[in-house]
Amino acid sequence: MTPEHLPTEQYEAQLAEKVARLQSMMAPFSGLVPEVFRSPVSHYRMRAEFRLWHDGDDLYHIMFDQQTKSRIRVDTFPAASQLINTLMKAMIAGVRDNHALRHKLFQIDYLTTLSNQAVVSLLYHKKLDEEWREAATALRDALRAQGLNVHLIGRATKTKIELDQDYIDERLPVAGKEIIYRQVENSFTQPNAAMNIQMLEWALEVTKDSKGDLLELYCGNGNFSLALARNFNRVLATEIAKPSVAAAQYNIAANHIDNVQIIRMAAEEFTQAMNGVREFNRLQGIDLKRYQCETIFVDPPRSGLDSETEKMVQAYPRILYISCNPETLCKNLETLSQTHTVSRLALFDQFPYTHHMECGVLLTAR
């Protein structure tokens, strides 16, 4: 695979290899055959980052070969959304001959939605001034005149200039309901929107007969919290990143959801609060004992759950675990399988044509 060519004819084979690999990894914990959710074979990534290469008068996006570290020119990127591909050409055309926009520009980041909105961030090794703002405003207006719903941001050391806003609003159809998700530039969002819809619908399906409340750790912008709210009396969710918490609060209001409470704290801190080890001002006014959480949802970083959180989640009758790294999932399962059994297993092909896998398990208490 190269950035400008996807081996779409190999999609089925690479997916089958992942299914076999996941089943083998999970064999010590479950004999289940994974439920498999396929990705679109192209134009599935909703965000992308590129370095810029200045070659005389020419200017173009580049990526680096993971093995050799050599530069690869990228004029089209079929893994990314159609909108990103359109913007890549338009941005180069708009920046190449404009000194204020081109000088010391070293990276462009693209974030797009299925609803055809985009935020484009230009990163510089220089101070950004009024001349830059005027040039960027003219470029933004020219892009909009082409029918592109785009917002531009300039970034430099300790500087961020938003011409109007640093977010876009995604609208995802999830099990018969449209959910609005505010996505903030430079904050985590699910890269594969089509796969995200399938993950949300799978999570809804496996929790459809739930009782009581849901506790969620690592909730981000409320991606899963908002979708799962319809299956539970209440949802209590934690997240540490301020922009993600702000986006989650907006999303709760925008979707008219009244049973989700977001707390800004790390999963490790929440574990301490639940165990009575520490008290936190951020929890004032929230009576944790009022929540009857029979299900806990975790979508941890690649490192998986730390040992204290492992112990904490074992106290819940049901654990829904989404993992972007099956190796750390299996490491966690060495502990979790002492008290719980794997009752559902799914593979989500979030990252086609790579060795990376995303998977989900539902664990029920023995």
Curated annotation (Swiss-Prot):
One GO-annotated biological process of the protein: tRNA methylation
Alphabetical UniProt keywords: Methyltransferase, S-adenosyl-L-methionine, Transferase, tRNA processing
Residues bound to S-adenosyl-L-methionine: Q190, Y218, N223, E239, D299
Highest taxon, organism lineage: Bacteria
Position of the signal peptide: none
Transmembrane segments: none
Organism of this sequence: Salmonella paratyphi A (strain AKU_12601)
InterPro entries in UniProt: MeTrfase_TrmA_AS (IPR030390), MeTrfase_TrmA_CS (IPR030391), SAM-dependent_MTases_sf (IPR029063), TrmA_MeTrfase (IPR011869), U5_MeTrfase_fam (IPR010280)
PANTHER family in alphabetical order: TRNA/TMRNA (URACIL-C(5))-METHYLTRANSFERASE, TRNA_TMRNA (URACIL-C(5))-METHYLTRANSFERASE
The protein's name in its UniProt record: tRNA/tmRNA (uracil-C(5))-methyltransferase
GO CC aspect terms: cytosol
Catalysis: reaction(s): uridine(54) in tRNA + S-adenosyl-L-methionine = 5-methyluridine(54) in tRNA + S-adenosyl-L-homocysteine + H(+); uridine(341) in tmRNA + S-adenosyl-L-methionine = 5-methyluridine(341) in tmRNA + S-adenosyl-L-homocysteine + H(+)
Record-annotated active site: C324, E358
GO molecular function: rRNA binding; tRNA (uracil(54)-C5)-methyltransferase activity, S-adenosyl methionine-dependent; tRNA binding
Similarity section: Belongs to the class I-like SAM-binding methyltransferase superfamily. RNA M5U methyltransferase family. TrmA subfamily.
Enzyme Commission (EC) number: 2.1.1.-, 2.1.1.35
